[in-house]
Amino acid sequence: MPKSPSKSSPRKGSPRKGSPRKGSPKRGGKGAKRAGKGGRRNVVKRRRRRRESYGIYIYKVLKQVHPDTGISSRGMSVMNSFVNDVFERIAGEASRLTSANRRSTISSREIQTAVRLLLPGELAKHAVSEGTKAVTKYTTARR
C-alpha cells in the first residue's frame, strides 16, 4: 500500500515550507500567467514501477563462466523468462508434494524432491549438490 505524501516532507513537485506555491502569483510575470491555468497546481510525477528481474544474477554467473562474453538485452530477456519458468515449475511441484504430505510449509526437502522429479539425470544431481552447498553456506553464515 503506497504512502500518501505527508505535508512535512518535501517531495519533488510538492511545495516546501516557506517557499511560494507553484500556482500562486510571484513578483515576476510568469507567476501571474500560471495562476490563470486551472487545475495544474501541485502536479506530482508518478514514480515508475521497478521491474524485478534476475538480470544481475544471470550476468554475475555469465562472468564467472565466460569473463570475456557479454549478453544482449534480448538474450537477457530469454534467460530471465527461463529462470522464471523453472522457478514456477519447482515451486508448483514442491507445493503439490507439501500438500500430498499434509504439511503447510515448503522445506528444502520438498524443493530437493521437486528438482529430482523435474530435471533429468545428471542435471538433477548437479542441481541438488549446488542447492545443498548453498543451504549449508547460508546456515553457517547465520551463526
Swiss-Prot record:
GO terms for molecular function: DNA binding; protein heterodimerization activity; structural constituent of chromatin. Transmembrane segments: none annotated. One of its GO terms (cellular component) is nucleus. A motif (SPKK motif 3) lies at residues 14-17. The keyword Ubl conjugation applies. Pfam families: Histone (PF00125). Monoubiquitination of Lys-137 gives a specific tag for epigenetic transcriptional activation and is also prerequisite for histone H3 'Lys-4' and 'Lys-79' methylation. Glycans are attached at residue 129. A motif (SPKK motif 1) lies at residues 4-7. A motif (SPKK motif 5) lies at residues 24-27. The modification Phosphoserine is found at residues 14, 19, 24. Residues 9-49 have a biased composition (Basic residues). Keywords: Chromosome, DNA-binding, Glycoprotein, Isopeptide bond, Nucleosome core, Nucleus, Phosphoprotein, Ubl conjugation. A motif (SPKK motif 2) lies at residues 9-12. A motif (SPKK motif 4) lies at residues 19-22. Residues 1-49 are annotated as: Disordered. It is found in: Nucleus; Chromosome. Belongs to the histone H2B family. PANTHER family: HISTONE H2B (PTHR23428). Core component of nucleosome. Nucleosomes wrap and compact DNA into chromatin, limiting DNA accessibility to the cellular machineries which require DNA as a template. Histones thereby play a central role in transcription regulation, DNA repair, DNA replication and chromosomal stability. DNA accessibility is regulated via a complex set of post-translational modifications of histones, also called histone code, and nucleosome remodeling. The nucleosome is a histone octamer containing two molecules each of H2A, H2B, H3 and H4 assembled in one H3-H4 heterotetramer and two H2A-H2B heterodimers. The octamer wraps approximately 147 bp of DNA. Contains 5 SPKK motifs which may interact with the minor groove of A/T-rich DNA sites. Phosphorylation of this motif may regulate DNA binding. This motif is reiterated in both termini of histone H1 and in the C-terminus of plant H2A, but its presence in the N-terminus seems to be unique to sea urchin histones H2B. This is Histone H2B.2, sperm. The lineage of its organism: Eukaryota, Metazoa, Echinodermata, Eleutherozoa, Echinozoa.
